[in-house]
Regions:
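Acceptor-substrate binding/catalytic loop of class I
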Residues: 85-101
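A short SAM/SAH-binding and catalytic strip from SAM-dependent methyltransferases
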Residues: 30-44
Length: 174
């Protein structure tokens, strides 16, 4: 469907971002995008995979969850509650980090021009608000999952301890 609307794109590949090395691409890519998925994996695993297919000076864009600076003030019990909540959304809390650690991690993988934009209001609040505005709750397992996800998004947004961010960065030339 994307290629119908953007016919000038030569190829669009849909695949697990953790196994990119196994795909035999003819050339490396100028741009790699991972939309609303990378936070389900360890950042180091994601970056290691992406670096195998990204050109020198190539651009990377992805979404991730980060911990706010207030995170360190939480008690062990409060952190454990978040760990359980995030696990329900297939997110491993141990993989999340603050923005400064995320930036350092990208730099270790030889990225620069790193931009981090907080999209928590648009994504977390926006999704939960949208679901709350629907006329009647739907019936079925999928509807229940959507309702639970909306409640989790609302909690994350209101508490402000976990942020939904968009990251862009440029790979340095060797």
């Amino acid at each position: 469907q994307i290629q119908q609307h953007l016919p000038h794109l030569v190829a669009i590949h849909q695949h697990s971002f953790l196994n990119l090395k196994q795909i035999q691409f003819k050339t490396a890519f100028d741009v790699v995008l991972c939309i609303d998925a990378a936070y389900h994996s360890n950042l180091n695993s994601f970056l290691a995979s992406v670096c195998t297919v990204l050109n020198a000076k190539g651009r990377l864009g992805f979404h991730y969850l980060i911990l706010s600076e207030q995170w360190s003030a939480l008690t062990t019990l409060q952190k454990q509650k978040y760990k359980w909540l995030l696990k329900s959304a297939d997110v491993n809390l141990d993989d999340l980090m603050t923005q400064s650690v995320l930036t350092q991690t990208l730099q270790r993988y030889d990225f620069s021009e790193i931009e981090v934009v907080d999209l928590s209001k648009a994504v977390l609040h926006g999704f939960s608000h949208y679901i709350q505005q629907l006329p009647q709750p739907q019936i079925g397992l999928d509807a229940v999952k959507i309702q639970i996800t909306a409640k989790l998004c609302h909690k994350l947004y209101v508490d402000g301890l976990v942020q939904y961010v968009q990251i862009s960065a440029k790979k340095n030339a060797p």
